[in-house]
């Protein structure tokens, strides 16, 4: 069963989570998930910059 928090406890928990620095492992996991999208965007930018008329 869920516990009920007072407003002060809820604010304190929220501030604790908000100020938590992101870990390098978390950033690596994020980049791993978005790897395909970054690859495609990189290829598109390369084509745009290298196209000559």
Curated annotation (Swiss-Prot):
Residues 22-53 are annotated as: Required for DVL/RTFL small polypeptide activity. Residues 1-16 have a biased composition (Basic and acidic residues). InterPro entries: DVL. GO terms for biological process: negative regulation of cell population proliferation; shoot system development. It is found in: Cell membrane. It is a single-pass membrane protein. GO terms for cellular component: plasma membrane. Small polypeptide acting as a regulatory molecule which coordinates cellular responses required for differentiation, growth and development, probably by restricting polar cell proliferation in lateral organs and coordinating socket cell recruitment and differentiation at trichome sites. Belongs to the DVL/RTFL small polypeptides family. This is Small polypeptide DEVIL 7. It comes from Arabidopsis thaliana (Mouse-ear cress).
